[in-house]
Amino acid sequence: MNPGDFKDFAKAMTDYITEYLENIRDRQVVPSVKPGYLRPLVPEQAPQQAEPWTAVMADIERVVMSGVTHWQSPRFHAYFPTANSYPSIVADMLSGAIACIGFTWIASPACTELEVVMLDWLGQMLGLPDQFLARSGGEGGGVIQGTASEATFVALLGAKSRMMHRVKEQHPEWTETDILGKLVGYCNQQAHSSVERAGLLGGVKLRSLKPDSKRRLRGDTLREAIDEDIRNGLIPFYVVATLGTTSSCAFDALDEIGDVCNASDIWLHVDAAYAGSAFICPEYRHFMKGVEKADSFNFNPHKWMLVNFDCSAMWLKQPRWIVDAFNVDPLYLKHEQQGSAPDYRHWQIPLGRRFRSLKLWFVLRLYGVENLQKYIRKQIGFAHLFERLLTSDERFELFEEVTMGLVCFRLKGSNEINEELLRRINGRGKIHLVPSKVDDVYFLRLAICSRFTEESDMHVSWEEIKDRLMMFLKSKGAVLIKIICSTTRRTKNILTYIKQNIFRDVGL
């Protein structure tokens, strides 16, 4: 491809992207395809000769878009959001053009240094303590990981490295195997599955502790578990406090947990993957009270802060424990400036890394802090709008207090009736939700996921839910008519059946 073709192709693609995003609400959210749909749409082998770029453009709708789930649609309410914005898309274009692999400072000085500064900018926006920021002149600093799952695992390995070092000093006769068998970490039962996975990958025990009635892990619960394990000869070394659980956006009691961890010198990692973006708004920082007691903190700008995936921001007070855990230093990666600037290969699992800080730089400059704050507040406002619509209908109930851009709700009645309602909602494909279950209670999650969302979209989603419920009730009514027409039993028995099998399911 020559420069002229590149310009033409890029112009056509930017036009296509703009048209796609600005009209995305017109598309069915989830595609009507089955596994294996794509293979028949493309040749069995790669072409021997080059094709024109226009041929590729012509195939995008037929091959790709026919099987895309449209996460940026205002009607997509599943999981948590994945962020998207024009500045971030353009930054990814530049990153792709530079095409550096920034594993050391010398591999691309700008790649490292912009990341250091952007993590300081971002940390200040959140109100993080200076101990986490490189600008403070201390040991602390930030790094961009690929995902919060990586950050959780990296923090666990750092905590493990620190505790192994301490225990070896106290018990030089113990082997690493002896120590590893005694290490134990803790988290909320509602913590993300990646926390459990980090324990498995790290080869250590991880206990999931029961939260209180508001789904929060409390300090007393953690203290009791730690005391019990110490009595049993174990070594507590790591705790994950979740701010905004995946199931219901509950917040652990960070301040209490921090006191317990500090008293026992246990590494405290804060996972604020989704909710952390809201902390750029001062009115939501009460959820992170006690963050100064943490050893590491993580949130995902790529979820809710208009920075495209992947961009997971992590800060550490003492990154040396991470560096020590990952330090493999072959001659071909050494350089004369080692020690003068971070070599981020020591702060992560992979060696290679993209120029991800460009996305932060572009977004923070082209939006500004005030507009990002307005965006977060607007999205939370949409969640409260849906909450009001929901609570105006006596057939529904909230499962969890609405604090961020997530509404957890259910139809009054059995789990089975809610499962059927969700099947009908998602089966039509106009909107898309996912469920969760806490304490054996099944509920639906409606997340505000798109930067294109407006008030009218919330009304559309609410009307679709009510419409699917009405169709479900009509199907129940058809069953009822069939029973009445075919039964020869007494009226009393019919009414009993109706009460037990029809009205009960919908909370009537």
Curated annotation (Swiss-Prot):
| Listed Pfam families | Pyridoxal_deC
Q: Which InterPro entries match?
A: Aromatic_deC (IPR010977), PyrdxlP-dep_de-COase (IPR002129), PyrdxlP-dep_Trfase (IPR015424), PyrdxlP-dep_Trfase_major (IPR015421), PyrdxlP-dep_Trfase_small (IPR015422), Pyridoxal-P_BS (IPR021115)
In the record, N6-(pyridoxal phosphate)lysine modifications are located at 303
Give the main EC class.
Answer: lyase
Describe the protein's quaternary organization and the partners it interacts with. Answer: Homodimer.
Give the GO biological process terms: amino acid metabolic process; carboxylic acid metabolic process; catecholamine biosynthetic process; serotonin biosynthetic process
The taxonomy runs: Eukaryota, Metazoa, Ecdysozoa, Arthropoda, Hexapoda
Give the record's keywords alphabetically: Catecholamine biosynthesis, Decarboxylase, Lyase, Pyridoxal phosphate
Reported cofactor(s): pyridoxal 5'-phosphate
Q: Name one GO cellular component term.
A: cytoplasm
Note the CDD domains from the entry: DOPA_deC_like
What is this protein identified as?
Aromatic-L-amino-acid decarboxylase
Family the entry assigns? Belongs to the group II decarboxylase family.
Coiled-coil residues: none
